[in-house]
């Protein structure tokens, strides 16, 4: 929270986090939880990154709009983000979809998820709204984006970054002039336009927007009254402002929080099983691109009380050990070996098992003599002794969710089918 006193714009801002999406490309990982509630990095949830960025930037009013399978997300927020104090002009509101506009409709789109809570926003009377997606992994100082918004007199400032053109179909794609004013904006185009001079790159929206509050609320009311609108920021609100107002692009490089000047700008969508696996496994690198050890920019989360990780047995073939791995509190590695793997809280790995390039979510239990490679194991899954995954693609695909890149997702329901 190093920015708290020195962030003149963030002190007058409210962060509004959109956290209602399912994230269907994560397959069974989001059968029972929203994408922002998916575990990441050993002890966090994906939403903790947007929330921590807001807190570390100096923002002290935060609202989170939830909808799909919200129970685990709400429980996490109540446990881990309950330290805001009204007497210090701080607030943290959880806003489930509650059919405030019509008894027949939940949130109809991202813009509607804000419109339905206009009264709550007005009650706090913030000067700025920082609108955030709750399902991306990155570290960013929103104060710098707010500063650009004010200096350029923008109606909306849109966070953006360069991505390979082939990947841009999943994002809003923009063109800018030499002053960073957005002159065109296409939401998820089938054929994304390239950046001038960079035929293989597109400039895309990060789903991060800064508005002055009055302007935003006026736009939301206008959009809500339009029967032809889908009530979505990327499809409706932003293109309208690009055409009729002043929309400005804020390049992520300008506000990315890095641990050194040589570090790259790190932002991940983690919207597929492959991307989710890769982003977690990347953390086992000697110097990962995402620095979770930056004490000046911590990733806040709910800290479950657990004993330290434990490694037991020291015999040839039955040695509890881990190489290039992250092992969280409460884990017990009993005569098993780990390589390039990430274990969340309370995982148990039994003797003679070998685990490589694998992400294991909380309280999973890996039985004796298992061999696992390139796997994601969902929370509380109990693997039977002798299970082998990652060596026979056809056999894996019959039993588990196997991606095109060869990553296997294992859930409790899949294991129960093996026993049936």
UniProtKB/Swiss-Prot annotation:
Primary enzyme class: transferase
Catalytic activity as recorded in UniProt: alpha-D-glucose 1-phosphate + ATP + H(+) = ADP-alpha-D-glucose + diphosphate
GO terms for biological process, alphabetical: glycogen biosynthetic process
Biological pathway: Glycan biosynthesis; glycogen biosynthesis
Catalytic activity, EC: 2.7.7.27
GO MF terms held by the record: ATP binding; glucose-1-phosphate adenylyltransferase activity
Function per UniProt: Involved in the biosynthesis of ADP-glucose, a building block required for the elongation reactions to produce glycogen. Catalyzes the reaction between ATP and alpha-D-glucose 1-phosphate (G1P) to produce pyrophosphate and ADP-Glc.
Protein name per Swiss-Prot or TrEMBL: Glucose-1-phosphate adenylyltransferase
Organism: Rhodopseudomonas palustris (strain ATCC BAA-98 / CGA009)
């Amino acid at each position: 929270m190093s920015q708290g006193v020195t962030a003149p714009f963030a002190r007058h801002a409210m962060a509004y986090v959109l956290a209602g999406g399912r994230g269907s490309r994560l397959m069974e990982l989001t059968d029972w939880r929203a994408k922002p509630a998916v575990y990441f990095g050993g002890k966090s949830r994906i939403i903790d990154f947007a929330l921590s960025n807001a807190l570390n930037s100096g923002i002290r009013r935060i609202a989170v709009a939830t909808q799909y399978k919200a129970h685990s997300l709400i429980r996490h927020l109540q446990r881990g983000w309950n330290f805001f104090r009204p007497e210090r002009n701080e607030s943290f509101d959880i806003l489930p979809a509650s059919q405030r506009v019509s008894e027949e409709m939940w949130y109809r789109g991202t813009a509607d998820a804000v419109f339905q809570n206009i009264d709550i926003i007005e009650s706090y009377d913030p000067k700025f709204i920082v609108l955030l997606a709750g399902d991306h992994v990155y570290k960013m100082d929103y104060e710098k984006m707010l500063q650009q918004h004010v200096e350029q007199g923008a109606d909306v400032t849109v966070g953006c970054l360069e991505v390979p053109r082939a990947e841009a179909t999943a994002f809003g794609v923009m063109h800018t002039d030499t002053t960073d004013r957005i002159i065109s904006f296409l939401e998820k185009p089938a054929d994304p336009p390239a950046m001038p001079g960079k035929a293989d790159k597109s400039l895309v929206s990060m789903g991060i927007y800064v508005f002055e509050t009055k302007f935003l609320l006026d736009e939301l009311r206008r959009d809500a009254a339009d029967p032809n609108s889908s009530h979505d920021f990327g499809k409706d609100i932003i293109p309208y402002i690009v055409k009729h107002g002043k929309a400005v692009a804020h390049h992520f490089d300008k506000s990315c929080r890095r641990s050194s000047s040589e570090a790259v700008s790190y932002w991940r969508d983690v919207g597929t099983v492959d991307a989710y696996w890769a982003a977690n496994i990347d953390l086992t690198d000697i110097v990962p691109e995402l620095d979770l050890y930056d004490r000046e920019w911590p990733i806040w989360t709910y800290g479950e009380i657990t004993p330290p990780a434990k490694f037991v047995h020291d015999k040839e073939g039955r040695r509890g050990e881990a190489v290039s791995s992250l092992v969280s509190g409460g884990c017990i590695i009993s005569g098993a070996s780990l390589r390039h793997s990430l274990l969340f809280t309370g995982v148990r790995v039994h003797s003679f098992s070998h685990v490589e390039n694998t992400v294991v979510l909380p309280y999973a239990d890996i039985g004796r003599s298992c061999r696992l490679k390139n796997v994601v194991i969902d929370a509380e899954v109990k693997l039977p002794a002798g299970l082998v995954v990652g060596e026979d693609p056809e056999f894996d695909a019959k039993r588990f969710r196997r991606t095109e890149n060869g990553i296997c997702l294992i859930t409790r329901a899949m294991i129960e089918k093996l026993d049936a």
